[in-house]
């Protein structure tokens, strides 16, 4: 910065200070200005006071008008009252009602414990759940949530909540809890209401519930918690469990709507169907104590004359397959609430429904711990699939003893342009020895539905809930033997020991399997090996949040597979096996070319002929 610039800046500064000093207001001007602003403040205060008085007067006037209107309302006497609680119960459940709205206030299940493993499970309590019925008359909608009911005709297992216009005109909500059951009958019946309610034969219903987090693992419970419903005469459907979702079902007839947790559900069932159904599910934040925020709007039949009551049901209970299945006993139209227990795709669901569940219940009846039950069940599955395992192994062993001959073919055709000839000669070799390269695939595919059946069954088995085994204190959720003070992407804030053991045994199984199946005929085998080793590592991240019972099953299953492979290899004399194959080659009568090998060989010959024709044309 030069001298001229500095001088210029100093002069500008002096001018600004001088101008500010010369243009300052005098003391008289300052006093006048203060007086002006003070007068404005006084006026504003007066205006605000007048406005407040006016609003108060209008409010009192509106209140008086509303009171005058309410005094002529149908249920004027029920607009004010005391919010009191009434409970009914049986051996398995206790249901509490509130007189404000005449609705279910809380649902407690006596035979199941909450996360503290001390107090019974409470599905909802207080404002966690709401339900309002909208009736109609000339004055508009009558929303039951705004009125006080009276509890009458109460017994240990039933209560009638009455919304009375007068002694002769009322609407009854009749709740009856069945003995030793989670099912509660719900009946709406009008008395003396003909002409006082609109003649429309329906009632609108608004039902909401914030589903509580009832299990330790938020992520996995959230994955299995979803709003589910059944279309009349059709299948069961649900909203997405992975994101906010909603659906307007229009005039589709619906049998029931369920607000589902992993192991428990609140189900609302219509005897005369629900229609005009709109359902919504919203995700809750982890740590809030809730899993999902559910809501449903629907309509159902209602006779204001009272000649025909509205029949409905509530189910507040466990997602236990046989408990839910038993509710259809004696019914012509099945509810199929057992579909709340997800058992997999149709074939896998069939295996679980008719085989896995019955075998599991039979083993559980011995009084064994659930860890031992899973161990025995896994061994039984391995015994069932052993013939397919043996066939797969023998196919691999045959390929292995023919490896030297395949290596000779590879040396014979080292050039890429001879790949077709090389492949044809390899297939010819397999055909001569009666070996199919796909011989081990079909047995593996036959095992898949059985193995997948347990994968689907274990996470849905409420019998595993809060059952401990070894270091796992609950087989229905993850077993965290290491907890991190931070969150690792895709892994979470813990490490499951059974998941880690499952990963290690899978790596060992992969290593052992790859050494047995290495024919050396394909150069891309190296990349395939890396993929096979990478998959167990991926399983560690995917299954770390899964139930420890599931990871325990996979760990034991893989361990048995490794042991089976070692045993088969030690008991299989590969020299004798090669001699048997050589004998088959020499005796054409013993040869039986497989359909796949024959078709593949024919296709290769046809391809070679086409290539030869192209070369001849050139």
UniProtKB/Swiss-Prot annotation:
It is a multi-pass membrane protein. The chain crosses the membrane at residues 3-23, 340-360, 365-385, 442-462, 481-501, 523-543, 548-568. CDD domains: 5TM_YidC_Alb3, EcYidC-like_peri. GO terms for biological process: protein insertion into membrane; protein transport. One of its GO terms (cellular component) is plasma membrane. The keyword Methyltransferase does not apply. The keyword Chaperone applies. Keywords: Cell membrane, Chaperone, Membrane, Protein transport, Transmembrane, Transmembrane helix, Transport. Required for the insertion and/or proper folding and/or complex formation of integral membrane proteins into the membrane. Involved in integration of membrane proteins that insert both dependently and independently of the Sec translocase complex, as well as at least some lipoproteins. Aids folding of multispanning membrane proteins. Belongs to the OXA1/ALB3/YidC family. Type 1 subfamily. HAMAP family: YidC_type1. This is Membrane protein insertase YidC.
């Amino acid at each position: 910065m030069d001298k001229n610039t500095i001088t210029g800046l100093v002069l500008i500064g002096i001018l600004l200070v001088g101008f500010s000093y010369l243009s300052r207001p005098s003391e008289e001007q300052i006093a006048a200005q203060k007086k002006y602003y003070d007068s404005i403040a006084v006026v504003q205060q007066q205006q605000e006071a007048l406005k407040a008085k006016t609003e108060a007067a209008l409010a009192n006037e509106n209140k008086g008008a509303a009171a005058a209107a309410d005094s002529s309302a149908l249920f004027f006497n029920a607009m004010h009252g005391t919010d009191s609680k009434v409970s009914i119960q049986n051996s398995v459940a206790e249901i509490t009602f509130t007189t404000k709205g005449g609705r279910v206030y809380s649902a407690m299940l006596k035979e199941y414990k909450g996360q503290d493993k001390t107090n019974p499970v409470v599905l909802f309590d207080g404002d966690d759940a709401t339900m309002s019925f909208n009736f109609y008359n000339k004055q508009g909608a009558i929303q039951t949530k705004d009125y006080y009911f009276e509890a009458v005709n109460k017994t240990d297992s039933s209560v009638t909540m009455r919304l009375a216009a007068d002694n002769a005109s009322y609407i009854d909500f009749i709740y009856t809890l069945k003995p030793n059951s989670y099912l509660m009958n719900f009946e709406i019946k009008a008395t003396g209401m003909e002409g006082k309610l609109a003649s429309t034969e329906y009632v609108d219903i608004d039902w909401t519930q914030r589903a509580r987090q009832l299990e330790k693992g938020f992520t996995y419970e959230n994955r299995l918690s979803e709003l589910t419903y059944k279309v009349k005469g059709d299948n069961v459907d649900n909203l997405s469990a992975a994101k906010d979702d909603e659906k307007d079902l229009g005039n589709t007839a619906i049998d029931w709507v369920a607000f589902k947790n992993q192991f428990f559900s609140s189900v609302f069932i219509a005897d005369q169907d629900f229609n005009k159904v709109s359902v919504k599910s919203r995700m809750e934040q982890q740590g809030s104590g809730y899993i999902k925020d559910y809501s449903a709007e629907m309509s159902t039949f209602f006779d204001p004359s009272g000649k025909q009551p509205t029949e409905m049901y509530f189910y507040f209970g466990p997602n236990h397959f046989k408990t839910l299945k038993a509710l259809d006993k004696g019914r012509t139209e099945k509810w199929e609430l057992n579909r709340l227990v997800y058992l997999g795709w149709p074939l896998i669901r069939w295996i679980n429904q008719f085989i896995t569940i019955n075998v599991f219940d039979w083993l559980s009846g011995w009084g064994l711990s659930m860890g031992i039950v899973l161990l025995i069940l896994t061994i039984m599955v391995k015994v069932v699939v052993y013939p397919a395992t043996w066939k797969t192994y023998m196919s691999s062993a045959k390929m292995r003893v023919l490896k030297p001959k395949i290596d000779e073919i590879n040396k014979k055709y080292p050039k890429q342009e001879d790949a077709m000839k090389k492949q044809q000669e390899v297939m010819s070799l397999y055909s001569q020895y009666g070996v199919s390269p796909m011989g081990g695939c079909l047995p593996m595919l036959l095992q898949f539905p059985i193995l997948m059946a347990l994968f689907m069954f274990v996470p849905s088995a409420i019998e595993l809930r809060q059952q401990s085994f070894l270091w796992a204190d609950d087989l229905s959720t993850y077993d965290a033997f290491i907890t991190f003070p931070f969150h690792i992407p895709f892994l979470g804030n813990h490490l499951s020991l059974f998941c880690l053991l499952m990963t290690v045994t899978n790596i060992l199984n992969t290593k052992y399997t790859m050494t047995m199946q290495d024919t050396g005929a394909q150069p891309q085998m190296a990349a395939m090996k890396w993929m096979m080793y990478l998959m167990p590592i991926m399983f560690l991240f995917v299954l770390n949040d899964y139930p420890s019972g599931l990871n325990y099953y996979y760990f034991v299953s893989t361990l048995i597979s490794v042991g089976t492979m070692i045993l088969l290899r030690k008991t299989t004399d590969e020299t004798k096996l090669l001699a048997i194959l050589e004998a088959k080659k020499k005796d054409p009568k013993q040869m039986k070319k497989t359909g796949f090998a024959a078709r593949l060989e024919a296709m290769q010959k046809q391809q070679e002929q086409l290539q030869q024709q192209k070369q001849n044309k050139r």
